[in-house]
Amino acid sequence: MNEPATHRKIAIEANNSTWEILAKPIAEITTDEAEEMTRRAYAAAYHWQRAEGFGPANDARAEWLLSRVWAVRGNGEVALGHARRCLSICESTGLVDFDLAYAHEAMARAHACLGDSAAARQHLESAGNVSIADPQDKAQVDSDIAAAPWFGVEQ
C-alpha cells in the first residue's frame, strides 16, 4: 500500500465520495452521514500526502475540504483551524487563483460559523478579489460561495 499511485487513486476516491454527502442539503445529512463525510475527508488528506505528484495544491485543497466538512457540521473552531492551514499553505507556497480564492472562502465560512460576521465578510471580499483565469474555475468558486451554510452572513 506504499505505492504513490495507489495513494493517489484512493485520495481521489475519498475526496469525491466526501462530496456525495457534502452535496446534499445540510438538513438532510444524518448524524451517521456527517461522521462518514468526516472520515472520508480525513482519508483523502492522508492519501493525498502520500500520493504520486503530491504538491501544495493537493495539501491546500485537502485542508479546504476538511474546513468545509467541519463548517457544515457546525464546528467553527475546527473549521477555522483547517481554513488557516489552507490559507497558510497558499501564502507560503505562492498558490494563487482558484486555490487562494478557496482559502479565503474557507476562512469566511469558518468565521461565519463562529458568529464573526465582520471577519467572514472580509474574507468573502478577499475571495471575490482574487483573479481567477479560468472561467470554469471562477464559476465553481462562485457556486461554492453561493452554497450554504453561511450562518446568517450575506454573501
How would you describe each model-predicted region?
Residues 4, 50-54, 91-96, 132-136:
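Short coil/turn linkers that connect adjacent helices within long alpha-helical scaffolds
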Residues 7, 14-17, 21, 40, ...:
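TPR repeat positional signature
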Residues 12, 59-61, 102, 140:
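Residue register of alpha-helical TPR repeats
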